[in-house]
Amino acid sequence: MADLQKIVDDLSSLTVLEAAELAKLLEEKWGVSAAAAVAVAAAPGAAAAAVEEKTEFTVMLAAAGDKKIEVIKEVRAITGLGLKEAKDLVEGAPKPVKEGVNKEEADKLKAQLEKAGAKVELK
């Protein structure tokens, strides 16, 4: 136990440059790479971040469909735009109807617009 404590004390007293040199010497002696160990250790965290679910969505009107008037009415109700602005948005599709909404609201808006006859995408 005393030997281990001496090693800990010796390692604690090393400067950063000495610790880097020690790491190089150990890599050569053991035939390993510290960079590979760091990459392997970081991989699970990166995978967890990739799985993280998107929290903000943009409801995109891809196409008005056959019931353009119904879609215009629904766009007006959702956005609060005037008749001309809503008509321009619908006729200018693909356009964003609402941005920065959560998943639940985005799904609700998508369902409303699709019920009116529009083709909708969530981004």
UniProtKB/Swiss-Prot annotation:
Protein name (Swiss-Prot/TrEMBL): Large ribosomal subunit protein bL12
A GO CC term attached to the entry: cytosolic large ribosomal subunit
Keywords, comma-separated and alphabetical: Ribonucleoprotein, Ribosomal protein
Record function comment: Forms part of the ribosomal stalk which helps the ribosome interact with GTP-bound translation factors. Is thus essential for accurate translation.
Glycosyltransferase among keywords: no
Organism: Rhodopseudomonas palustris (strain HaA2)
The keyword Zinc-finger is annotated on this UniProt entry: no
Biological classification of the source: Bacteria, Pseudomonadati, Pseudomonadota, Alphaproteobacteria, Hyphomicrobiales
Subunit and interaction comment: Homodimer. Part of the ribosomal stalk of the 50S ribosomal subunit. Forms a multimeric L10(L12)X complex, where L10 forms an elongated spine to which 2 to 4 L12 dimers bind in a sequential fashion. Binds GTP-bound translation factors.
GO MF annotations, alphabetized: mRNA binding; structural constituent of ribosome
GO biological process: translation
Family: Belongs to the bacterial ribosomal protein bL12 family.
